[in-house]
Amino acid sequence: MLKAVSADVSALTGKKQAFLLQVLPDGKLLVAGSDSHGTAYGIMELSCLIGVSPWEWWADVTPEKKTSFVLSAEYQTLQSPSVEYRGIFINDEDWGLYRWSKNNYEKERGNFGPKTYAQICELLLRLQANYLCPAMHDASMAFHRIPENRLVADS
């Protein structure tokens, strides 16, 4: 596909989790990543450019409606992380996240599981993070005890 659009993505070579957003001479927008994380981060960066907050779900930040979105013909950004591991540690989840999720979001499970972790993993992608130390208190059940959690995290 890259040959078909005559795009030079050599700047991505040798970089981990890097992405390139570039308006091509024909006006098409190229989103390319050095790996799957890089590609996802590029898509999420585009989402930020159009006004979607990484916290849109968690903080009820509704994106402002726009009638159009335009990037300049010269637009190009190449980004790669300067820190290898970037992420979050879910600590003391039994005081907040666990109770909220079991009472509001995953009532059928009575715990938090794949639906909640799907939102956590999306937030990680939106924040260009790659590391999650999941919940493990007895109240919330350890991450690995619910097989669907891993499927969500790997997708």
Where in the sequence are the language-model features?
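Aromatic-lined carbohydrate-binding surfaces of glycoside hydrolases
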Residues: 2, 82-155
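Contiguous, structured surface segment used for ligand recognition
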Residues: 1-80
